[in-house]
Amino acid sequence: MNHACDLLVIGAGPAGLAAAATAAKLGVKVTLLDEQAAPGGQIHRAIEARTIKPGVALEDEERGAALVREFRNCGVHYLPGTQAWQLEPDLRVYVSDGDKAACIQAQRVIIATGAMERAVPFAGWTLPGVMTVGAAQIRLKTATWIPPANTWLAGNGPLLWLYAAQLIEAGGGIRSEEHTSELQS
């Protein structure tokens, strides 16, 4: 896997896919890697493999599918299931794919790894049915799972609002939503 490229993009979510496809169209030799097995990131997880039940087409499905199709057709060297674990000042990037390690020498690097959900423990957080919004969104996108209509959403950050909109669009109901993002000094 040791090789060189003009641009290495780390992360195959919407930003990474768009950056890689745009650069490739401009003639740049691009390599894109992501730890997941398929492109799309959290927001378009499993978009190529997903079968959505009739009436459960999420608004951004077609945009996500089009972005992945564009990426697949632009000639980018794609390394799925690969983790970057070290970036040197001279832009050597050390990566692992299963039990194999390698080095990629890049002229430029774009880090487009997206946001990370951080679960905050609270009383009852390990009870059945209690999950993070990221886990609930994965279930909606990969299994078309819609929780019961008496679902409560609580937390902060933009993923909560996105999931609430996707859940309603998919025919789900929300009993209550609590957004807690007060800034404190």
Regions found by a protein language model. Give the residues of each.
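FAD-binding core/adjacent interface of flavoenzyme oxidoreductases
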Residues: M1-I10, R63-N150
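Rossmann-like dinucleotide/flavin-binding elements
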Residues: A4, I10-L32, M116-E178
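Hydrophobic/basic alpha-helical segments enriched in Actinobacteria
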Residues: G13, L26, T82-L87, S181
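Conserved N-terminal glycine-rich FAD pyrophosphate-binding loop of Rossmann-like flavoproteins
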Residues: Q36-E59, E117-G129
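Flexible loop residues that form catalytic
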Residues: I47, G114, L183
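Short beta-strand to alpha-helix junction loop
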Residues: T51-R69, L159, S181
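Conserved small/polar residues in nucleotide/adenosyl-binding loops
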Residues: E178-S185
